[in-house]
Amino acid sequence: MQGAAVWAIPRAARRTGVGLRLRGRTLKNVYTGLVGDIGGTHARLAMVDEEGHIRHPVTFEECNYPSLTDVIATYLEKTLGRKRPERAVLAVAGPVVDGEIQFTNNSWRASEGELFVAFEFESVRLINDFAAQALAAPLLPADTLRRIGPDLRGADLAPLVVMGAGTGFGVAGLARSNRGDVEVAGEGGHGAFAPSDDTEVEILRILSQRFGRTSVERILSGPGLHNLYSALAAIRGVPATLADEAAVTAAAETGDALANETLDRFCAILGSVAGDLALTFGARGGVFISGGLAPRMADRLASGGFRSRFEAKGRMSAFMAEIPTTLIQHPYAALVGAARALKRPAAGVR
């Protein structure tokens, strides 16, 4: 993904309809835009060239910036100088309501209207980050995907679902047809956790004492991984000595028994939730797993209890056995989906 120059039309040229020339084409007709993947911890921004390729991707630590506007301003100044892209699509972590987002896992808020004014975009659109990944899923190269479980082919034009654990737990579906695809954003991570065995019943009891209501995200996320570790420590009657999810993951690599039990249980619960989502969406096109945590557990997902728990749906087990489960390993999947959304007729504020 080497950088390539991206141009925007001076506003005077836009008003007069006069296009500047560039290698035999008018800049007015060159397709350009800004795309972003704004999660709970990191903000990733990139440009999209006239061929739809991702250019100049940069990752920002959100804790170093007071707002999304500051991140975008920093990126554009360093990447384009005084030039500005015409359009923007930003994939954001949380529900977008009337063009506004209050981020679920940090203190930022943003709106299409504010970004439109601040950067003089011709149009700007906010979409859910997992909706962007759902748009990307059918387009991702095979070498950026890893099959988890049987090497199955998803049904053509059947719905698919993308889910994943990071700072939180995201979910979105993609409804497919010959007339095009439509993403369906959701907040499935805030659905209730459903235990599948006696140990998970006890996990639910412990976490409910702490949180009141225990959602999927209280377990299937970075912070949730540590919640799960602490609950299992209480069940086993041993001290929870590891400070956070990174310490749990590191301890598992050195053979710590409780840390390994935690990761195995995490993958099993992820399989159950993936199966529930496949049933909810009728996702015969496949379930795609993304997020910051799963790629670091790829071998454990492939060899552990994920797939068996995915298929363990009683009378629907035969149905589940035909649905492929795939790990997304593309580093910029949400940006690919945002770039796809950028190709649509202008939406959002314009």
What are these regions (language model features)?
Residues A43, P95-V97, G168-A172, N227, ...:
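Short, acidic Gly/Pro/Ser/Thr-rich loop/turn segments
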Residues R147, D151, A155-V216, A298, ...:
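Glycine-rich phosphate-binding loop of actin/hexokinase-like ATP-binding domains
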Residues L80-L126, A131, L135-T144, V162, ...:
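Short beta-strand-loop/turn "lid" adjacent to the catalytic site in phosphate-handling enzymes
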Residues E61, N105-N106, R125-A132, D151-G154, ...:
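Active-site nucleophile and cofactor-binding loops and adjacent substrate-binding regions
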Residues S123-A155, A246-C267, S272:
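ATP-dependent carbohydrate kinase catalytic cores
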Residues G33-D37, R87-V89, R125, L160-G164, ...:
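Short glycine-aspartate micro-motif
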Residues W7-I9, A13, L22-L80, R84, ...:
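ATP-binding/phosphotransfer module of carbohydrate and carboxylate kinases, centering on a glycine-rich
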